[in-house]
Design a protein with these regions (language model features):
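N-terminal amphipathic alpha-helix/helix-capping segment at the start of soluble metabolic enzymes
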Residues: 1-26
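Hydrophobic faces of well-ordered beta-strands that scaffold small-molecule active sites
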Residues: 23-27, 44-46, 84-88
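Conserved, mostly hydrophobic/aromatic
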Residues: 25, 29, 36, 75
Length: 98
């Protein structure tokens, strides 16, 4: 069986620069990430929209860092090829409140 190569940010950059088609999808759990990876998806985005689509909140403002880490960990445990991007919750990256 061929060894599966894990995509890196350098691979994504090269694919972009060479205009090579890439497949992206938003996924929040282990089973879906496993099947997406098996299907050859290149990039899996773990978005804060998981709070609305999975947890049933009315908007993404309810996303916490702990929740986003939990979703990202579940996805990364499932994949061997895809590059995983984890979203940050709203305002978790803001340095000040001007």
């Amino acid at each position: 069986m061929d060894e599966v190569k894990k995509l890196t940010i350098k691979d994504i950059r090269r694919m972009y620069e060479e205009k090579e088609p890439m497949s992206w999808i938003s996924i929040y759990d282990y089973p879906m990430a496993y099947y997406a990876d098996q299907a050859g998806i290149d990039v899996i985005f773990v978005g804060d929209s998981s709070t609305t689509t999975v947890l049933g909140y009315p908007n993404t403002l309810y996303a916490s860092m702990d929740q986003m880490i939990m979703f990202a960990e579940a996805v990364t445990r499932a994949v061997k090829h895809a590059f995983v991007i984890g979203d940050l919750p709203y305002r978790s990256y803001q340095a000040s409140v001007m």
